[in-house]
Design a protein with these regions (language model features):
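Membrane-water interface of alpha-helical transmembrane segments
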Residues: 26, 30, 51-58, 119-126
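Intrinsically disordered, low-complexity segments enriched in polar/charged small residues
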Residues: 29, 33, 98, 127-128, ...
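A hydrophobic membrane-anchoring alpha-helix module
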Residues: 106-149
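Helical transmembrane-bundle signal
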Residues: 40-43, 64-71, 132-143
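Cytosol/matrix-facing amphipathic helices and coiled-coil assembly/linker segments
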Residues: 1-51, 71, 77-79, 94-95
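Membrane-interfacial hairpin junctions
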Residues: 44-57, 147-149
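Inner-leaflet juxtamembrane helices
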Residues: 31, 53-108
């Protein structure tokens, strides 16, 4: 039995880490896109039934808030999976930077903190989802108020 080539193992590790990262980062953006589209449909439905059926609009708004909550939880998990891929890629980047004698190849380490004035994806997604959650709740309260008049 021959010993495994360390360079081959390092290459396999890098490919595995990259595939993991790419899969979960793509899924995260697709989930966000689906959330935005679903939110647009819910808002359109809410607006179209609000005047004639305010109780139904309230239920729809509460369903939107509920879905927003769960999309936020799903994004938190996706964030964790993406971070796991980044952690694995850091090792490959450190090895590559050392072999190439080029510390600029440690890209993830250089980008740990967003630039001044920039925000992380996690922060932006959370702010968007929190705002939509609050708007759905306010919409539900407004529809309930209309239904009681």
């Amino acid at each position: 039995m021959t010993a495994a080539d360390p360079d081959d193992i390092a290459k396999q590790a890098r490919e595995h880490a990259w595939n993991w990262f790419a899969l979960h980062a793509t899924q995260r953006m697709q989930a966000l896109n689906f959330f935005v589209v679903a939110t647009a449909f819910l808002i359109a439905a809410y607006a179209s039934i609000l005047e004639k059926h305010p109780a139904a609009a309230a239920v729809l708004a509460l369903a939107g808030a509920w879905l927003t909550f769960w999309f936020n939880r799903l994004d938190a998990r996706s964030y964790q999976l993406v971070e796991a891929g980044e952690d694995a890629l850091r090792v490959s980047q450190a090895r590559l930077a050392s072999l190439a004698d080029n510390q600029s190849l440690m890209i993830l380490d250089a980008l740990d903190e967003p630039a001044p004035g920039a925000s992380s994806y996690r922060r932006v997604i959370t702010v968007i989802q929190s705002t939509i959650f609050a708007l759905f709740l306010l919409g539900a309260l407004y529809a309930i108020r209309l239904s009681l008049m």
